[in-house]
């Protein structure tokens, strides 16, 4: 094969040479190729090396046969590996793609890249008569000379394969050479895999290594050598592409799929690379040959039936081709070649195919939108031949080296424009924008400059002033003499000079950053920072410290950003996608995209030469810079200010206003983020986008792709475009702030997504331009509404208004709603949707209208950006990291792992803490949000979370129905909702989710101890038994329960409390989730939590936690209604139901406390939480409800904050309202506890004074109004306790409800609280005393827990003393822990933390709590770990210790307890009740919380109790799948948060801090906790 390929290469080369000789046009191309080659050689090592480096470039033929030989060998090796890797990488699952290694190389070469491949493929090409004529016209085709074309064709065929593997259009493209047999990839020895990889890698490398490679890619199809075939074959090929473009429906579908898979970017990259490889070798025949060989392989593969492929999915082929061309570099490369070498062929091709022509026209109309997008597309268009050079260059820009662009273009008059318009031309080859590519500038430092310009245009644009300089570093300068004012030192090397300048002049200047270089055009204008001066000095010294690390690439840049941009040529990354509706063109830098958009999609030339007397205007800043530098001299560089004036790209009107703006800001593109910084621009951008939509009604989506793809670089409009187009654009989400779309765009998933998805989007848009436009308009309207945020969301999410409402309504708690990021409130008070909101909505929107570009883009990115829907994977991760929120976990899960860009962007998003919005949301949250959005808008449900399948139904439901707003019955509350997507709402419900409240419902609290199944079964008997036996009746007892249940869960009636079976709220997703959860529980699927990713678990927990923590104080008091409360709780057993109840209770009981709880929002670290806790304790009733589940319920505020995540919007908020009224606070609180206390409640009810049945005990205890008050606090505490049992106490269920620590504990606590007035002091002092004291004295971290817990406990204790001991005695830690939680609030709230609780108990508990981290779980195991005076106390202590350890609330509570005047228990309780909020605020608590989270994870079921505690920490984990790590991370974030708000509900604070955990050692703590939890589970 290699021999063949070599000979092929040789022949090809000869042909190429001949062609060059034959055609002047070819000669032109040849020159370009030479220039390219030169550039490549200059910038990079010899082409061969370069190729070698990019083994994938095998497709390209080396310049020499030897080179080819080498290439084939090396590429074979590397390429195979890389191909495989890439396939795997991009193709997370592309079964159909065959092994690339041997087939790839072998096929490529075996199939005489030209001949073997050509014939078989060309016959199929004949399918496209339009294309075929060119093939016949050029015999080379059949001769095998038209190797390049075949390469492109195979990809087309591959496209079909792509259909099979939409995710990897490129891969299918090549790998699936037998596109029909995706699996036949290997079947085709032409090695579809390698072709895929090769083209992709080659493309990437070619981009990086040398524009020439890009060109080579282009050359592949249009290499000068193959000018004849190139002309014919490429023309034919392009014709086909154009044709296909017209019919790109199939491929569009595939592409969207690919985009959805997150491989859109890669696909586009690959396609571009393929194109590039095939058609972008105007510079080096050898390289093109290689690429051709590679491409030929697939195409030449006999198995690859082009005809069939075309017939099967002509659109797919077109799309692939287009996408290929779309790639900035491929496009440019091809365009460049196309112009020069294929001019005639292209003309012929176009004319030859009527369909082609039609497509042509379509493309033209889409213009470079599509064609331009695919550098060679314009060539496809008849006009393309006219401006072949120019066009290729536009395509080249990204791929082409500066030299290539400048040299090649410089060769031909058009080339020059091409260089400048390398991107521009790509965009608008027809415009024949002769961007005066000052070959001199570009050529002088082609690598640094040309590349910079194009790939680095973004970078250059970013640092306009300096970048300008950088870009303007025209010649390769190598200064060795210092020309600083007053210094004339001479050095032997540039390095010495640089060292001298940096040390003697720059550093010596201290804070005066002025360039005093003689004749410096800056005229000693000071820089803002020293680094800017340092970088600037490189213009004078010629230093280029940033060298390309790719093998064979010798490019070096003075600016790191330029290097990064250049590296995209090697990686093939093209994050900047044309924002135009039908244009799938992607670029490696925003500058190129801006050029393309301004040139192709707009006649606007926003960049005006400011030099007096000069009237020149340009579409992009790089062209303007070149003009100024070339025409007016290096001294007349354009300043940033000028650019600003110039780039007022206020082209909102501009068709690609958004793009143009985004690009035009081209300079901003560089800083699209930087310059987009114009927040005003962001705003205006949106308007512009809308305007642009109007202007380009045809391509409203065009803008959209840009937001994601170009958004970061481009810009302001792009994000706006996103907004307007998608109604919500991913980039916005990324940005974290609507205003700073630029920043958002930088991180936006859409960027990458757009790369991937944009192609699909564009294809889709093209396919259905009218429909897409219409959809776009609809989306725009929607977006406008959404931008109104609340107005829009509410309307959009009426069905699941609760979910959305909380997002919106959580203005205060909105952050909590986002649970992952307090600041993340999706629809908080912001006038616009937060970036996350936008992203979420956008994703949902996209789902709704996949046809629309945005939709398509999202289809691409939808999966890849599960977590940060708006971010590509990379961006999403950035957002996630930045957020430090549970969302992190979901980033990987939600987003398509395969989507490279998506991954990269998602990581960026995760890193940028500034994006609290959707990005901050955990995958589950985002999924919920999306699901809600979809439900509201009637769009398709969001893509299920990655791990959803393995989640039990209940878990899935929990995720889906995160908030499970009663009104919001997301159709796919279970699967449809993405775990990561589940917006804030799901979280409230999330409480329940812990899973899923079904089996887990009872065990929630004990879940950590008990693993899912165990927890389900075991807790079910004790807890569930209590819940089922007692709780159902209790639940049924009150409509309040029902209201609670309805709101948050399906157990509106007592009967449904834990069972959820009879959910009075069938419509709400929550109910569905509850039912599902119950089913799962019944099926012992509680393990779901165990199986659920840590992120998901955390998310669920955080939802629950919010409720618990916030409601704990009042939850206990609410427990006063435990009798019916437990039932209610049972109903709320599900997070939503619970949350709803909690909300109500919170509102009713202690608004102050409630609010306090709210501050405990997941992300909130403010001590306000602690204060709220205090309030909560004071107003036990309001938090008393299931703080675990509904922040809002227990503490109107607290609940909401957490609920947004858990119960969030629907569950949390609505329940708050409903539950509040129905339950009158305490009872409602109890209901809230019901998720944990449902069982608990039953236990309490049934076993009023039963030590094991602490919950029942509590319930049984007499409840008085005061008790109710206490119950409120106790209820909240109970909720917390529920959460706690979930943690370490799960095993240590002290109450009779070991089954559902959360619910049991909650119910118990509620019961206690109910009895608190009467016997709350007793029980509280005993149980709570133990638990509380244990926590309080135990450790500072546990204090919080202790306080909250102790408070609940104390109330409970004081109320049902026997219960407390019973709880302690009870072996089920989860319950005990839950009780503790309940107690603390109870005690603090109700009996005023009955001082009855012995100091010893408190102290013991405190002591125990001190080691709660470990003791927590251990405590669960050994209920009496800390020989407490009271068995119950001990248990409670253990339980609470566990709980608080995890919550890290004990220590603070302890401290607080110390402050209390009552016995330690009493004091602690009081402190807890009084300082519940304080506890929330303490960091120790949160730290403990971290552990708590871990524990809760262990006890997946416990999560209900732990919701508040664990939700925060575990929230991310839920999605992540790795419990310990995610939790640790989340907890770490929690830690920070924990510190602040943990008192009232350590868990809510934890939830908040989960994402922003400040405690770095939390991971170890969490790990140990997880281990402990496991141990406890085992013990249990």
From Swiss-Prot:
Positions of crosslink type Glycyl lysine isopeptide (Lys-Gly) (interchain with G-Cter in ubiquitin): 773, 779, 784, 800
Tissue distribution of the protein: Is expressed in a wide variety of normal adult tissues, including lung, colon, spleen, placenta, testis, and myometrium.
Zinc finger (C2H2-type): 480-505, 513-540, 546-570, 576-601, 607-632
Entry keyword Repeat: yes
Comp. bias (Low complexity): 703-726, 863-882
Cross-link (Glycyl lysine isopeptide (Lys-Gly) (interchain with G-Cter in SUMO2)): 438, 462, 779
Biased composition (Basic and acidic residues): 461-474, 632-648, 684-699
GO terms, biological process: alpha-beta T cell differentiation; anterior semicircular canal development; anterior/posterior pattern specification; artery development; axon guidance; branching involved in ureteric bud morphogenesis; camera-type eye morphogenesis; cell differentiation involved in kidney development
Function of the molecule: Has a dual function as a transcriptional activator and a repressor of the sonic hedgehog (Shh) pathway, and plays a role in limb development. The full-length GLI3 form (GLI3FL) after phosphorylation and nuclear translocation, acts as an activator (GLI3A) while GLI3R, its C-terminally truncated form, acts as a repressor. A proper balance between the GLI3 activator and the repressor GLI3R, rather than the repressor gradient itself or the activator/repressor ratio gradient, specifies limb digit number and identity.
Protein name stated in the entry: Transcriptional activator GLI3
Organism: Homo sapiens
Phylogenetic placement of the source organism: Eukaryota, Metazoa, Chordata, Craniata, Vertebrata
């Amino acid at each position: 094969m290699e021999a063949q390929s070599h000979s092929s290469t040789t022949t090809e080369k000869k042909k190429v040479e001949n062609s060059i000789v034959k055609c002047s046009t070819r000669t032109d191309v040849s020159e370009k190729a030479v220039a390219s080659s030169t550039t490549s050689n200059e910038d990079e090592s010899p082409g061969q090396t370069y190729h070698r480096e990019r083994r994938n470039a095998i497709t390209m033929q080396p310049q020499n046969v030897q080179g080819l030989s080498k290439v084939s060998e090396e590429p074979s090796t590397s390429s195979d590996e890389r191909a495989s890797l890439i396939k795997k990488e991009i193709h997370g699952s592309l079964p159909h793609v065959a092994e690339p290694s041997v087939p790839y190389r072998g096929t490529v070469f075996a199939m005489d890249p030209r001949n073997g491949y050509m014939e078989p493929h060309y016959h199929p090409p004949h399918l496209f008569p339009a294309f075929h004529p060119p093939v016949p016209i050029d015999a080379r085709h059949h001769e095998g000379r038209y190797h390049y074309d075949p390469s492109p064709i195979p990809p087309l065929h591959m496209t079909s394969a792509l259909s099979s593997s939409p995710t990897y259009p490129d891969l299918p493209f090549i790998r699936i050479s037998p596109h029909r047999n995706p699996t036949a990839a290997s079947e085709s020895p032409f090695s579809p895999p390698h072709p895929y990889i090769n083209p992709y890698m080659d493309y990437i490398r070619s981009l990086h290594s040398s524009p020439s490679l890009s060109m080579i890619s282009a050359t592949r199809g249009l290499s000068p050598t193959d000018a004849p075939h190139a002309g014919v074959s490429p023309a034919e090929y392009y014709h086909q592409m154009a044709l296909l473009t017209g019919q790109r429906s199939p491929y569009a579908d595939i592409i969207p799929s690919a985009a959805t898979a997150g491989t859109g970017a890669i696909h586009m990259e690959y396609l571009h690379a393929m194109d590039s490889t095939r058609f972008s070798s105007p510079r080096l025949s050898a390289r093109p040959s290689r690429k051709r060989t590679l491409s030929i392989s697939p195409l030449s593969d006999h198995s690859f039936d082009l005809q069939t492929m075309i017939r099967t999915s002509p659109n797919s082929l077109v799309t692939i081709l287009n996408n290929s061309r779309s790639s900035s570099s491929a496009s440019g490369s091809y365009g460049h070649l196309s112009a020069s070498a294929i001019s005639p062929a292209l003309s012929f091709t176009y004319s030859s195919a009527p369909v082609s022509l039609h497509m042509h026209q379509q493309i033209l109309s889409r213009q470079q939108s599509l064609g331009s997008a695919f550098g060679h597309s314009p060539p496809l268009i008849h006009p393309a031949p006219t401006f072949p050079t120019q066009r290729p260059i536009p395509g080249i820009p990204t791929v082409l080296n500066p030299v290539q662009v400048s040299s090649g273009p410089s060769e031909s008059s058009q080339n020059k424009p091409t260089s400048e318009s390398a991107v521009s031309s790509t965009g608008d080859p027809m415009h024949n924008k002769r961007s005066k590519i000052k070959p001199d500038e570009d050529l002088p430092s082609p690598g640094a400059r040309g590349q910079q310009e194009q790939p680095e245009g973004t970078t250059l644009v970013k640092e306009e002033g300096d970048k300008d300089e950088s870009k303007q570093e025209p010649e390769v300068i190598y200064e060795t003499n210092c020309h600083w004012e007053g210094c004339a030192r001479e050095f032997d090397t540039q390095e010495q000079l640089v060292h001298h300048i940096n040390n003697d002049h720059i550093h010596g200047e201290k804070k005066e950053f002025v360039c005093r270089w003689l004749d410096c055009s800056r005229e000693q204008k000071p820089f803002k920072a020293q680094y800017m001066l340092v970088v600037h000095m490189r213009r004078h010294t010629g230093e280029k410290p940033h060298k390309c690390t790719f093998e064979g690439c010798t490019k070096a840049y003075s600016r790191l950003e330029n290097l990064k941009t250049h590296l995209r040529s090697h990686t093939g990354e093209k994050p900047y996608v044309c924002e135009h509706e039908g244009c799938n063109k992607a670029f490696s830098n925003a500058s190129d995209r801006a050029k393309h958009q301004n040139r192709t999609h707009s006649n606007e030339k926003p960049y005006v030469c400011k030099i007096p007397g000069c009237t020149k205007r340009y579409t992009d800043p790089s062209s303007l810079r070149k003009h100024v530098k070339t025409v007016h001299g290096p001294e007349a560089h354009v300043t940033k200010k000028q650019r600003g004036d110039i780039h007022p790209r206020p082209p909102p009107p501009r068709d690609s206003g958004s793009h143009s703006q985004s690009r035009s800001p081209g300079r901003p593109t560089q800083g699209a983020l930087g310059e987009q910084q114009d927040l005003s621009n962001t705003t205006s951008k949106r308007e512009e986008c809308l305007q642009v939509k109007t202007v380009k009604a045809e391509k409203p989506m065009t803008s959209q792709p840009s937001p994601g793809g170009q958004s970061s670089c481009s810009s302001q409009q792009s994000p706006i475009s996103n907004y307007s187009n998608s109604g919500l654009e991913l980039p916005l989400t990324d940005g974290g702030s609507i205003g700073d779309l630029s920043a958002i765009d930088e991180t936006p998933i859409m960027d990458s997504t757009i790369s991937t998805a944009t192609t699909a989007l564009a294809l889709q848009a093209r396919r259905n331009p009218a429909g897409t436009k219409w959809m776009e308009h609809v989306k725009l309207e929607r977006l406008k509404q959404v931008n109104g945020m609340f107005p829009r969301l509410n309307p959009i999410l009426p069905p699941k208004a609760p979910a959305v409402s909380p997002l919106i309504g959580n203005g205060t708690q909105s952050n909590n709603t986002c649970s992952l990021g307090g600041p993340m409130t999706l629809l908080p008070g912001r006038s616009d949707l937060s970036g996350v909101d936008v992203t979420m909505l956008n994703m949902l929107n996209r789902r709704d209208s996949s046809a629309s570009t945005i939709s398509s883009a999202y289809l691409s990115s939808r999966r890849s950006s599960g977590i940060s829907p708006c971010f590509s994977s990379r961006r999403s991760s950035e957002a996630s990291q930045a957020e430090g929120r549970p969302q992190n976990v979901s980033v990987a899960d939600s987003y398509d792992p395969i989507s490279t860009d998506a991954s990269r962007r998602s990581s960026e998003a995760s890193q940028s803490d500034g994006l609290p919005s959707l990005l901050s949301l955990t995958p589950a949250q985002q999924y919920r949000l999306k699901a809600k959005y979809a439900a509201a808008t009637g769009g398709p449900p969001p893509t299920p979370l990655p791990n959803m399948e393995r989640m039990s139904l209940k878990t899935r439901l929990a995720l889906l129905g995160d908030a499970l707003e009663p009104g919001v019955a997301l159709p796919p509350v279970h699967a449809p909702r993405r775990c990561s997507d589940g917006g804030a709402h799901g979280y409230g419900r999330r409480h329940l989710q812990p899973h899923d409240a079904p089996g887990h419902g009872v065990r929630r609290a004990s879940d950590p101890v008990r693993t899912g199944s165990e927890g389900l079964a075991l807790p079910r008997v004790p807890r569930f038994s209590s819940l089922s036996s007692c709780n159902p009746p209790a639940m049924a007892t009150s409509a309040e329960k029902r209201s609670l249940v309805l709101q948050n869960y399906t157990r509106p009636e007592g009967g449904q409390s834990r069972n959820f079976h009879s959910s009075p709220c069938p419509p709400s997703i929550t109910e569905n989730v509850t039912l599902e959860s119950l089913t799962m529980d019944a099926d012992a699927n509680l393990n779901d939590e165990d199986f659920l990713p840590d992120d998901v678990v955390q998310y669920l927990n955080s939802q629950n936690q919010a409720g618990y923590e916030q409601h704990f104080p009042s939850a206990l008091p609410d427990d006063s209604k435990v009798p019916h409360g437990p039932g209610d709780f049972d109903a709320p057993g599900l997070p939503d139901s619970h949350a709803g109840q909690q909300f109500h209770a919170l509102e009713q009981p202690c608004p102050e406390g409630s609010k306090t709880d709210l501050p405990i929002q997941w992300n909130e670290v403010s001590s306000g939480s602690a204060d709220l806790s205090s309030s909560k304790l004071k107003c036990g009733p309001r938090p008393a409800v299931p703080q675990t589940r509904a922040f809002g319920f227990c503490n109107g505020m607290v609940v909401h904050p957490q609920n947004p995540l858990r119960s969030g919007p629907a569950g949390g908020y609505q329940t708050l309202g409903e539950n509040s009224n129905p339950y009158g606070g305490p009872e409602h609180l109890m209901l809230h506890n019901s998720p944990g206390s449902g069982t608990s409640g039953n236990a309490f009810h049934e076993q009023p004074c039963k030590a094991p049945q602490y919950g029942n005990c509590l319930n049984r205890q007499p409840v008085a109004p005061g008790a109710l008050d206490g119950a409120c606090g106790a209820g909240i505490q109970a909720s917390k306790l529920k959460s706690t049992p979930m943690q370490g106490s799960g095993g240590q269920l002290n109450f009779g409800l070991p089954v559902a620590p959360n619910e049991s504990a909650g119910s118990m606590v509620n019961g206690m609280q109910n009895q608190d007035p009467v016997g709350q002091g007793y029980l509280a002092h005993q149980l709570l005393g133990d638990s509380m004291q244990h926590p309080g004295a135990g450790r500072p971290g546990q204090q919080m827990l202790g306080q909250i817990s102790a408070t609940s406990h104390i109330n409970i204790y004081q109320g049902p003393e026997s219960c407390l001991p019973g709880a302690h005695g009870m072996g089920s830690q989860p319950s005990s822990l839950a009780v503790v939680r309940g107690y603390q609030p109870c005690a603090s709230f109700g009996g005023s933390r009955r001082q009855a609780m012995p100091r010893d108990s408190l102290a013991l508990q405190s002591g125990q709590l001190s080691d709660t981290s470990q003791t927590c779980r251990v405590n669960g195991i050994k209920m009496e770990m800390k020989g407490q005076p009271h068995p119950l106390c001990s248990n409670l202590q253990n339980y609470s210790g566990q709980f608080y350890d995890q919550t890290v609330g004990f220590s603070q509570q302890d401290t607080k307890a110390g402050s209390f005047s009552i016995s330690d228990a009493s004091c602690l309780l009081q402190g807890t009740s009084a300082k519940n909020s304080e506890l929330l605020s303490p960091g120790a608590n949160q730290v403990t919380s971290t552990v708590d989270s871990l524990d809760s994870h262990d006890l997946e079921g416990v999560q209900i109790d732990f919701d508040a505690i664990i939700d925060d920490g575990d929230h991310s984990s839920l999605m992540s799948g790795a419990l310990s790590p995610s939790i640790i991370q989340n907890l770490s974030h929690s830690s920070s948060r924990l510190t602040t708000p943990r008192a009232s509900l350590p868990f809510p604070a934890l939830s908040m801090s989960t994402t922003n955990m400040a405690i770095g050692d939390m991971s170890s703590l969490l790990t140990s906790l997880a281990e402990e939890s496991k141990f406890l589970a085992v013990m249990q």
